[in-house]
Amino acid sequence: MARSVWKGPFVDGYLLKKAEKVREGGRSEVIKIWSRRSTILPQFVGLTFGVYNGSKHIPVSVNEDMVGHKFGEFSPTRTYYGHGADKKAKRK
């Protein structure tokens, strides 16, 4: 179920403040965030965020195509090692 239009996109308040500080300073540093649920806004384009995946911060460079998506979509939390090999085939 999609979010209601009258509510607008969800973004944590501290995230807006951090992004504004980096824009004012003109620095190109990675902004560490823990809010995977926040929506990417147009004012975040060009910035790099370190999105926490449960163990480390994954750098995510925001571009125009990402606007409207959530930060968590670009920082996978699970590692896929592939399906287990067939034990019968290994013995031969």
Swiss-Prot record:
GO MF annotation terms: rRNA binding; structural constituent of ribosome
Any single Gene Ontology cellular-component annotation: small ribosomal subunit
Highest taxon listed in the record's lineage: Bacteria
InterPro entries in UniProt: Ribosomal_uS19, Ribosomal_uS19_bac-type, Ribosomal_uS19_CS, Ribosomal_uS19_SF
Keyword line: Ribonucleoprotein, Ribosomal protein, RNA-binding, rRNA-binding
PROSITE patterns noted in UniProt: RIBOSOMAL_S19
SUPFAM superfamilies: Ribosomal protein S19 (SSF54570)
GO process terms (BP): ribosomal small subunit assembly; translation
UniProt family annotation: Belongs to the universal ribosomal protein uS19 family.
Function: Protein S19 forms a complex with S13 that binds strongly to the 16S ribosomal RNA.
UniProt protein name: Small ribosomal subunit protein uS19
Taxonomic source organism: Rhizobium johnstonii (strain DSM 114642 / LMG 32736 / 3841) (Rhizobium leguminosarum bv. viciae)
Gene from which the chain derives: rpsS
